[in-house]
Amino acid sequence: MSRGLGDVYKRQEQMFDMLRKNEVDLIFTLDSHIYDSEFIICAEHEEKVHFFASVDNPLLNKENISLKELCTEDFVLTESNMSYRKLLNNELAAQSLEIHPVLEIGNPLQICSLIKNSKMISFLPDFITEDYYNSGEIKHLPVNDCDVSVWTQLLIHKNKWKSPALNAFIDSLIHFSKSPSPPE
């Protein structure tokens, strides 16, 4: 069962409360960029997000597609409470637009699999779609008026004592973090 946005914000705030109370050591987020003087950003990376379609989708014949035009297409999207979907919905609302997906799925890899074999389109971070993109199964759509980015951030409370083990863990996460997304 899908939970509402209120539940998502409540759970997110609970995570930050746990960090403030020293109940958790770190938080790893995938959302809009978080600025808070209580937290230290140990690592962060801006993740590009694109609309994408199968390689034979007729929309790829266009040089530029407006968000308004795109809204008339059939979409498969993640559930509305996912961070990047929430950011897309905010961008749509800012332009007085909305998308009515034909299907909402919680698993983004299932979305990629569906899109590569259909005329539908979707919107996901590049780190999720990069294998499909690099293998030539999907392509990014040239949408000219939607600039949404999500950030992965590793946060720690500013007063948290970092043991050698915690420092080693943070260093490992930074070392093994993903390389930049594929080119557009």
Q: Model regions: which residues?
A:
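Short helix-initiation/N-cap motifs at beta->coil->alpha
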Residues: 10-17, 104-112
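Hydrophobic residues within well-ordered alpha-helices
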Residues: 18-20, 70, 113-119, 154
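Short beta-strand-centered segments that line the small-molecule binding cleft or hinge
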Residues: 12-49, 53, 116, 139-141
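A late-sequence structural motif
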Residues: 139-183
